UniProtKB/Swiss-Prot annotation:
Coiled coil: none annotated. It comes from the Bacteria. CDD domains: INT_XerDC_C. This is Putative tyrosine recombinase CA_C2066. PANTHER family: PHAGE INTEGRASE-RELATED (PTHR30349), TYROSINE RECOMBINASE XERC (PTHR30349:SF81). It comes from Clostridium acetobutylicum (strain ATCC 824 / DSM 792 / JCM 1419 / IAM 19013 / LMG 5710 / NBRC 13948 / NRRL B-527 / VKM B-1787 / 2291 / W). Keywords: Cell cycle, Cell division, Chromosome partition, Cytoplasm, DNA integration, DNA recombination, DNA-binding. Site-specific tyrosine recombinase, which acts by catalyzing the cutting and rejoining of the recombining DNA molecules. Belongs to the 'phage' integrase family. Although strongly related to XerD, it lacks the Arg-His residues of the Arg-His-Arg-His (R-H-R-H) sandwich residues that are clustered with it. Residues 1-83 form the Core-binding (CB) domain. One of its GO terms (cellular component) is cytoplasm. GO terms for biological process: cell division; chromosome segregation; DNA recombination. Gene3D superfamilies: 1.10.150.130, Intergrase catalytic core.
Length: 292
């Protein structure tokens, strides 16, 4: 089975998926492989009962429905590949009905909380200037962390106030920037040369001059959230989610938000409508209920 897994991943690497997506697929299939080994079950023996048994195993181990669905999708795609190659007669996962996902929406920052977060970096230090520019761009554009960290100096146009961003499958999109983000970038570019000891084209890098990692950015946003006294669960995508919901709150149409976020599927963007409704209901309740 190990050889088949490697052949499969050699195939899907050609699809220009992100490394994070491929890594997630690999973890899912590896875990399923370990499950089969423990059961002493061969790949060709897998049927819908095996899949149901595996789902129960994941549930017992505390996996959320969303995680289980992703696991099953990964396995289904693997078996689809095996079926196409003639290794399996059919795909056992197609007979399995996916569990419905109860969406637990991530926490969204209020505009006041975003202001607190963005005021966190110390504008008198090179690190603070860099951090401020990164956070302002994240909130101004709603781009993904990987998109932010892959930006080069050639992707920004301060004169016309836009950023050129490359998303999934290297698809390019142009995102406008607000005046705050532009101003922070102008200040940052003055100190960037001093920080760029490795002479690289990436717009942002760590204090050693290397390309910043996702973990490095996560530590930055976590630090300022704690220092700002924000109690909500913060992650590297909180500003992206808040960007989308705040646009909805201020009347932006869902199609425009889809284009700004780089979603290929409108259904993904419409999740933010549910997040907005949840936030809006909570706000109305707090303002209007006498015992809120």
């Amino acid at each position: 089975m190990d050889n088949l897994i490697e052949q499969y991943f050699a195939e899907i690497r050609k699809k220009n998926l992100s490394l994070n997506t491929i890594d997630a697929y690999r973890r899912d299939i590896k875990k399923f492989h370990e499950f089969l080994d423990e059961k002493g079950e061969k790949l060709r023996e897998v049927d819908v009962i095996t899949i149901m048994s595996y789902v129960q195993y994941l549930q017992k181990n505390g996996r959320a429905n969303s995680s289980i669905v992703r696991n099953i999708v990964s396995i289904r795609n693997f078996f689809k590949y095996l079926e196409i190659k003639g290794i399996m007669d059919d795909n056992p996962v197609t007979q399995y009905e996916m569990p419905k996902i109860r969406r637990n929406f991530p926490d969204i920052l209020t505009i006041e909380e975003v202001e607190k977060l963005l005021m966190g970096p110390d504008g008198n230090t090179d690190k603070g200037i860099r951090d401020k520019a990164m956070l302002e761009i994240m909130y101004a554009t709603g781009m993904k962390v990987t998109e932010l960290l892959n930006l080069t100096i050639y992707d920004i146009n301060l004169k016309l106030s836009y950023i050129k961003c490359r998303g999934i499958k290297n698809k390019e999109r142009i995102i406008p920037m607000g005046s705050y983000a532009v101003k922070c970038l102008e200040i940052y570019l003055k100190v960037r040369t001093k920080l760029n000891v490795q002479n690289i084209d990436y717009l942002f890098f760590n204090l050693q001059g290397d390309k910043m990692t996702r973990q490095g950015f996560w530590k930055i946003i976590k630090q300022y959230a704690q220092e700002s006294g924000i109690k909500k669960k913060i992650n590297a995508y909180t500003l992206r989610h808040s960007f989308a919901v705040h646009l909805l709150q201020n009347g932006a149409d869902i199609k425009t938000i889809q284009e700004l976020l780089g979603h290929s599927d409108m259904a993904t963007t419409q999740i933010y409508s549910g997040m907005y409704r949840k936030t809006r209901i909570a706000e109305v309740y707090k303002k209007t209920h006498p015992r809120a």
